[in-house]
C-alpha cells in the first residue's frame, strides 16, 4: 500500500505533494496557497510571517540593550544612553520598515531583512 502525502495550504485546500510545484524553500510555509497544481506564496501573509520573525529575533536584542542602557544610566554616560535609545528605537521600528511594506515579491521581502539592526538574515 503506497502512502500519499498531501500539502495543505493556508486556506485548507489540499493537493497530492507529488503532483504540485512547490516554492524553493519553506520559510513562508504558512503563506502557501494552492493555485491549480502550483503552490504560490501569498505576499500579504508572508509579510506578516516576516514581521513575526523580526519580533522573535529582536526580543533578546532588546533585552540585551536594556542591560546596556541600565549600565549607561548607572555610569551617567549620556552618549551611551543616547546610543542605546537609538538602537532600541531601531529594533522597535524594524517590523514597520518601508522595505517590507514596499516589497512586491518574496525575494524583495527576504532582502528587506535589515542586518545592521537585526543581525544575520534567516533568509540568506
Where are these regions (language model features)?
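A preference for well-ordered globular domain cores
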Residues: 1-124
Amino acid at each position: 500500500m503506497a502512502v500519499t502525502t498531501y500539502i495543505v495550504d493556508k486556506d485548507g485546500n489540499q493537493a497530492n505533494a507529488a503532483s504540485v510545484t512547490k516554492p524553493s524553500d519553506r520559510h513562508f510555509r504558512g503563506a502557501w496557497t494552492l493555485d491549480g497544481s502550483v503552490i504560490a506564496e501569498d505576499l500579504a501573509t508572508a509579510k506578516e510571517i516576516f514581521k513575526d520573525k523580526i519580533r522573535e529575533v529582536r526580543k533578546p536584542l532588546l533585552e540585551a540593550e536594556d542591560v546596556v542602557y541600565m549600565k549607561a544610566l548607572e555610569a551617567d554616560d549620556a552618549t551611551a544612553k543616547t546610543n542605546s535609545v537609538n538602537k532600541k528605537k531601531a529594533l522597535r521600528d524594524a517590523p514597520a520598515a518601508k522595505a517590507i511594506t514596499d516589497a512586491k515579491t518574496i525575494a524583495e521581502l527576504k532582502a528587506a531583512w535589515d542586518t545592521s539592526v537585526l543581525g544575520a538574515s534567516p533568509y540568506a
